[in-house]
Amino acid sequence: MQFLWLCLLSAVTLQFTGTLAFYPIKLPDFTKGIISHHGSVGRRFFTFPGLYKHAHTGSTTLNIRRGPSNYRRDNNYPAQIASPPTAPNTLGINNDGYDFSYFSEVKVGSEGQKMWMLIDTGASGTWVFGSDCTSKACGRHNTFGKEDSKTIKVTDEKWGVTYGTGKVSGVIVNDTMSFAGFELVTPFGSASTASDDFLNYPMDGILGIGPQDPNAKTPTVVQLLMQQKLLKSNVIGINLQRASEGATDGQITFGDIDKSKFSGELIYSNVVPNGYQWEIAMDDLIMDGKSLNLKGRTGIIDTGTSFLILPPADADLIHSMIPQADKGSGFYTLPCSTKVDIKLSIGGVEYTIQPDDYVGNETATKGTCNSLIVGRQILGPKQWLVGDVFLKNVYSVFDFDKNRVGLAARKYAGTKNPPSSTPSPGMFLLHAIHCQKTISVLMLHIDPTSNKAPSGGSPGLPAESGSDSTTNGEATNGATSSPNSSSSVLTPTWLTLAVFFAIGSSLWS
């Protein structure tokens, strides 16, 4: 297995101690036909063909004062901007309009340079594009450097993230980051070079909020918040919005839980033993009421991953339950009208995955869409990468003190088909072997010459029953845990940001 690490580096001499990787996926053909979603056509517009079947045709409509709108930065990346949050220590999460990447505005340096930062629970490292970067990709993003801040301290410590097809690299800098009511002095990576792979990415950097390897020498952004006792409690609550619903209430809350964003109670699952990711045990997958008996699986809960990515054998089984699903050239397609009820059972609760979230855009064959459940062997034989296809349906809580993940059914106020969760007949306690120490990036690649829209593109041990109740009506289940300007609109002819995640420990010492 090849490796990749997205990491916040310490202010000491850093050396690579592992192999780094990038996983491209070539998807089948597409058409430029767009299917309207089932909601109000007037609520949302895109300026180019959508990746999901609910995108619209039509010219850009800007509504500055009210309702969801397609706000556009000087560097011409589209976004569905989140409504200003009302809860304290909360940051709005913007959507790229396709539910593929979620990012927030962070102010960096003494002058408050605005940067769009990918919210990534799959990595603990933080970095931005540096103003000294001359790469083409940097010219299409907001950058940050000496001219933007009086307080920046540039070190000579090298930093880099390498992909199979390119890389981003530079040095470590120290400066302030302001977000969600906090102002924090922190080290982070400043990219002086970046490959063309970043040309169409909306984000100007990554804000890593994954758990840190306890052996790492440098604290992460979240660790600094905790060390300085700036958080009410050492938890982070996240709800992602679904673009097709016209929702703009995506947000991340630092130090608290927003109970208005979910229904029912939060059910917690402990992170697998010795895991340095938000990896938890999963019970099963249920389709139209039938258990697939997918026992012993674990899932890495990752906001930086667009899809539900799982071993090919599991993907084959799931699609065998969907009428007329076809593997074709290696990536599944299914009828655009698919309404199969899919529930992922975690911690004894079945969480619905809406068809709008797993059915992608239409292919060259009328009435046939791409599946956003992707079979790809990038982890262990029983490890899943549980991304936004699932996370749009839940409110997720990441508890750093108790090393656990909490989930509850997401509440979409005033929208159609709200997600639901159903208690399972029994609780399961799944133990999982520690995941391979690998770090990977998976992206869906579309032919750059095409003008067609892309699609929304460790072995387990036997299960045993058991659950532990906690206070405040919560329950716990699981294994015991130890902008620069561009002259033209950037059309995403290849998928901009499918997956950013990190598994294991730091590749630097």
Curated annotation (Swiss-Prot):
One of its GO terms (biological process) is proteolysis. A lipid is attached at S485 (GPI-anchor amidated serine). Glycans are attached at N174, N361, N484. One of its GO terms (cellular component) is side of membrane. Coiled coil: none annotated. Residues 451-489 are annotated as: Disordered. The active site is at D120, D302. Residues 466-480 have a biased composition (Polar residues). Probable GPI-anchored aspartic-type endopeptidase which contributes to virulence. This is Probable aspartic-type endopeptidase CTSD. It comes from Arthroderma benhamiae (strain ATCC MYA-4681 / CBS 112371). The lineage of its organism: Eukaryota, Fungi, Dikarya, Ascomycota, Pezizomycotina.
